[in-house]
């Protein structure tokens, strides 16, 4: 029996809601598979749910959601017409730290399944942690949180098990108040505008010139394995 995309997506949500891969599953209220239009060519990925997200079962609720919606509006994008999810889908009573490998590694199959299911034209990476786990972990690039600011506004092309993906990198909306890079919001909005133009052109079958960084998947070094717990 061939399932429709809607049925496959429903199955994905049910699997996420029933997940007990890591200890966070015992303290969450609502595991968050995602929200928005599942048929969208655009997928937005943030770090992890906060308390209000967990209470409402909605991705990017509260102030972070308002900031993201504001940026999308400036790029002439509709929040409800894109699909949003998190790298970690359960609230831990606080934000998970990067060193908590269990949460990120256990949730990784859900993210990969979502990418395979959606096969989005564009993936928007919100912040340092999704950037590290979805892009850097497959390469030999080493970028710390300070170095990440140089990547905001850039586009990365990476070939993975779900196909070639264009990642558009923006600052996470919850971190936009930082003084470290006062231009992070404007660079993020420009990245969203570039992403929209790319998606529209792709849908029309038109040429889509993009300034991209090509990253190839490579074996991890011993240092990366020890530092980040990557295999």
Protein language model regions, located:
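A polyanion-binding, active-site-adjacent surface
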Residues: 2-217, 228-231
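Cationic, low-complexity basic patches in intrinsically disordered or flexible, solvent-exposed regions
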Residues: 225
